[in-house]
Amino acid sequence: QEIGITGGEPTLIGDNLFTLINHIKKVLPQTAISILSNGVKFADKEYAMKLAKCRHQDLQIDIPLFSDIAEEHNRIVGAKTFYKTVQGLYNLALFRQRIGLRIVVHKQTYKRLPQFADFIYHNFPFVAQIAFMQMETTGLAKENFDELWIDPYDYNRELREAVLLLADRGMKPYICLLYTSD
């Protein structure tokens, strides 16, 4: 069994996130927890430490990165969060938390997937997994479909190179493609 905690942004509830984790741990002790977060709040070392103090035996924080270039990540996100996200990753690693990276692939980012993979290898060797995610066409992505959508077939060369680069170096890359009925 697994419980996914997402949002919005789950860390916006502050310390109540730890109350929730501890409650799940008490009531469903064998249940894995997956938290999808932008990672920014974990740039606060104290907050990252509080997560570690929950001592949940099967918890993973999944954090999306949109580029290996700060300006590009910030443009896509719409806020200057790159360096705080990176610091959050380092703080979580400092406290030995299991981390997954989510790399959302779209028209504006696919060309740099091999360089992005190299960046991940050199800067985040501690992550448990790297998931290359096909873009979901919801929310702002749906509104900007023409600027963002690219068929996975059209980026398979770059994706293959990125995945093999990470796998050959002992990391755990995954590919997530979404089924569409169209």
Where in the sequence are the language-model features?
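C-terminal scaffold of the Radical SAM
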Residues: 101, 124-129, 139-171
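Conserved small/polar residues in nucleotide/adenosyl-binding loops
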Residues: 179-182
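Radical SAM/AdoMet-radical enzyme domain recognition
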Residues: 2-4, 13-133
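Active-site neighborhood of divalent metal-dependent phosphoester/pyrophosphate hydrolases
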Residues: 8-10
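Aromatic-lined carbohydrate-recognition surfaces of secreted/lumenal glycan-active proteins
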Residues: 174
